[in-house]
Amino acid sequence: MAAISVVVTSGIGPELLHQIISGSPKIKVTDASNLFRGELKGDAAAKAKLDSLLARAEVIYGLRLPQNVLARAPRLKWIQVMSAGVDRFLDIDMIDSPVTLTNVSGIHAIPISEFVIGLMLMFV
């Protein structure tokens, strides 16, 4: 069985990337954050390289998605976004597609609570 191709479109840092890569030999993680930024700046070479990665991608992980991601990633099964909301990704193509779209809703509750309490304690 071939490894599952995961394309990361947002910079997550080398330590976290290494943690994900070493998690299982059944996944192949590619950091495409520089290519994604290049595409946003109009770099045709970066777009071509990103297209090549997206053509094989089964999973995309990131804060933002490449334009026309569903058309560019025909093997795509799952998109994991790094934000709590996914409303900005829900166009008719995404809604009608078999791709699973998930978010990180709820994971920030404790850190935000601790931060707010810390700010309140500054005034005591």
What are these regions (language model features)?
Residues 56-124:
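Phosphate/diphosphate ligand-binding glycine-rich loop within oxidoreductases
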Residues 1-59:
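N-terminal glycine-/charge-rich "phosphate-binding" loop or analogous flexible N-terminal tail
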